[in-house]
Amino acid sequence: MAVAAALLRRRALYSALASPSWLHDTSSCYICSISGTHSLVNHPNLRLQRGYHNSGKFDLTDLTHPHIWYPNAREKKRNVFLHVGPTNSGKTHNALKRLEASSSGVYCGPLRLLAREVAQRLNKANVPCNLITGQEREEIEGAKHSSVTVEMADMTTEYQCAVIDEIQMVGCRSRGFSFTRALLGLCSDELHVCGDPAVVPLIQRILEPTGDVVTVQYYERLSPLVPLKTTLGSFSNIKAGDCVVTFSRRSIYMLKRRIEMGGKHLCSVVYGSLPPETRTKQATMFNDQDSNLNVLVASDAIGMGLNLNISRIIFSTLEKFDGICNRELTVAEIKQIAGRAGRYGSKFPVGEVTCLNSDHLPLLHSALKSPSPIIERAGLFPTFDVLSLYSRLHGTDFFQPILERFLDKAKLSPDYFIADCEDMLKVAAIVDELPLGLYDKYLFCLSPVDIRDDISTKGLIQFAENYAKKGIVRLKEIFTPGTLQVPKSHNQLKELESIHKVLELYVWLSFRLEDSYPDRELAASQKSICSMLIEEYLERSGWQQNGRKDFLQKPKRLHQEYDASQLRKYFQEIDVRSK
């Protein structure tokens, strides 16, 4: 019974809110007697899985029937409604109206920005709604609704209504498994699933063995999207409401400077490594008709999660570096970005789209006329309990070799693929050097570390090392509050963005190992200061003197836009530093 006791102790130690619930989708398991040298778990999922085999032992690497992993959902005959259509078609709006009208429910989105937006919408409609993301918890007394990032969705709570947004992300190599888990596992009478029509055949196949009733509702775009026959031409043709899209930090700031040098426009910027709060603030200033920031320069981060009043999308290029090589944008990527132009009920109801380079126009026009390629497979990833049992069967707590072996042996149906674990394996190699248990290693491997960012990676290593040595990690041992300053160059800006990632990592860990990472409030306040300083840099960088002077008529604007308590902390630290 040693395995049983260990699993139960671990499970008691970590509550549902302390970690993403999908870590323990097998948390309802009952431990049975153990015979011989192998430990068998009499979990409903594994019990059902055994029914698919005639052998006398379980095959933990058999992932061919993932719908049986969620017995609570299988006890229901769910009514599943697929709301599918292009950007700006109203598909998500209709699903959210049903969520508002339900007695209990959950919204599962791909981004914190979307989760926060939905929580605010429901609370404004007098429907108390919690916000739960990897880095945030805002719980409302008496709330029966929650808005969560998809990884945080709870498979054990029963809801009247659940909504999954951007379901086409089941095909994402890195995060698709979280959407698959929500699709198969949410225990809800009604499940409303929103996304691209390209995912419909796959969803229908996946849900067929569940017994759920599936209804598909197709939507058309509410406002026209017009692909232009000519390129932008000169940058002097930039006009208010334009969004120039490019795919690297360097080119974003280069284009921003070039546009502002014309003396007619000031630019907001949005890209992935900006803090979410900064992205929201930049989008708000772009949307504000009283602001002089009437042009947006952005990456594909605008594809989802931000409400933007864009009149025209201008692609500076139709190629991007995907972490491995430069490649052409896919049809789905082009349509997702282009679709942000024009917004029903906004100042720009008709959207336009063009390019800087005339050689790119044929690809742009072809992509907009084409249906998105059908999504063939959905992502899967084993839960911690499965990997824990697998490691015990092989007599090792080294996570990297266990994960590699499991992935090599995993058996899948044609509708699924195993999630891309390249980054996870790199983190596993780091934490395997430390005296940590398997669960802790697994947790660090799931953490939001940017393994391609040196500062972010060093932060993870220090957090893990201090945790392994002392069991408690004080933020001040790694990071000195009061040392942050407004960046003076792009390199310093990038460094500040990386520091923000490290602080976010600390907050993430503090929600899962609360006693060991006790400085959540300090990390959160420093995170807010990072965002403030980045925004101050964006206000200073590249603006023409007259335009900047014109815009900053209210010198206290920055002060007014931040929570007063955060500002007090910030300026107290500045005072201490000056002494």
UniProtKB/Swiss-Prot annotation:
GO BP terms, alphabetized: auxin-activated signaling pathway; cytokinin-activated signaling pathway; gibberellic acid mediated signaling pathway; megagametogenesis; mitochondrial RNA 3'-end processing; pollen development; positive regulation of auxin mediated signaling pathway; positive regulation of cytokinin-activated signaling pathway
Top-rank lineage group of the source organism: Eukaryota
Record family assignment: Belongs to the helicase family.
Subunit comment: Homodimer; in free form. Component of the mitochondrial degradosome (mtEXO) complex which is a heteropentamer containing 2 copies of SUPV3L1 and 3 copies of PNPT1.
GO CC terms: mitochondrial degradosome; mitochondrial nucleoid; nucleus
Subcellular location, record wording: Nucleus; Mitochondrion matrix; Mitochondrion matrix, Mitochondrion nucleoid
Transit peptide: 1-59
Protein known as: ATP-dependent RNA helicase SUV3, mitochondrial
Glycosylated residues in this chain: N309
Function: Major helicase player in mitochondrial RNA metabolism. Component of the mitochondrial degradosome (mtEXO) complex, that degrades 3' overhang double-stranded RNA with a 3'-to-5' directionality in an ATP-dependent manner. ATPase and ATP-dependent multisubstrate helicase, able to unwind double-stranded (ds) DNA and RNA, and RNA/DNA heteroduplexes in the 5'-to-3' direction. Plays a role in the RNA surveillance system in mitochondria; regulates the stability of mature mRNAs, the removal of aberrantly formed mRNAs and the rapid degradation of non coding processing intermediates.
Signal peptide interval: none
GO terms assigned for molecular function: ATP binding; ATP hydrolysis activity; DNA helicase activity; RNA helicase activity
Cofactors that this protein relies on: Mg(2+); Mn(2+)
Induction annotation: Induced in seedlings in response to high levels of salt.
Broad EC category: hydrolase
Record-linked Gene3D superfamilies: 1.20.272.40, 1.20.58.1080, P-loop containing nucleotide triphosphate hydrolases
Keywords for this protein: ATP-binding, Auxin signaling pathway, Cytokinin signaling pathway, Gibberellin signaling pathway, Glycoprotein, Helicase, Hydrolase, Mitochondrion, Mitochondrion nucleoid, Nucleotide-binding, Nucleus, Stress response, Transit peptide
Catalytic activity: ATP + H2O = ADP + phosphate + H(+)
InterPro entries the UniProt entry points to: DEXQc_SUV3, Helicase_C-like, P-loop_NTPase, RNA-DNA_Helicase, SUV3_C, Suv3_C_1, Suv3_DEXQc
One Pfam family this sequence matches: Helicase_C
